[in-house]
Amino acid sequence: MSKGRAVRLNRETDLLKLVAIVAMFIDHLGAVLFPGVREMRIIGRIAFPIFCYTLAAGCCYTRSMAAYSVRLLIAALISQPFYAVGLNHVNSYMRELTFANPLLDSVKWYLYSFKTCNIMVALLLGQLVIWTLRERKYLLTALLAFFILFLDSHGWIASSYGLKGILLMVLFWALIDRPLASFVWVGGYMFAWALEGRGYDYFGITFGIQLFAMAALPLIYIPLDRHFRMPKSVFYLFYPLHLLLIYFLNTMI
């Protein structure tokens, strides 16, 4: 596989990130504050495929995969406590802590919170897999795959779509220079994923809510020429801050 892949899908990745950020915010507001408003969760389904695609495109554009990994790692570590409290992912291990030793129990609370990882962890794992494939380090790819399978089997990356989500990132990257093949394979993969769920019946077929994630595909595959630019820091800062905002809103309502 060539390192220098030409991105032949939508190159307006900053604009796509902005769309995904807004959709994610609506989704998370719906999950925590308006659980009965199903439409908010439906809107939010477009966010993850877009993040997967922009991650794949970023792996083609970046000058340093190592620096890219470090940014994602730092974002994942910083965002985790905000994710845990913002989206109510406080597990039984965390609740049992008495904080008799504030420092030690705070460290334990933080480590226990990774029983449910934030999306930055999934993006980091996807980026690392793509990096090993790009460099043809297939032994490292295999080791990473086993590690991801372990995390997925224990539910630690389930909230970030688990193994399926990481495979979607790799699929976007592998076919990013072949639009038609990418559309067929990615569309088919996402459709099959939607068939695994329940709750929506169309044309005699039962789908899960992931069916609505396919609404992201036109945004990804139709080229735009807007030249919209957004600082890299916006997404990395917005992610933990919007979770903190949701936490405060939830405590006030």
What do the predicted segments below correspond to?
Residues 1-253:
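Alpha-helical transmembrane segments and their immediate juxtamembrane cytosolic regions
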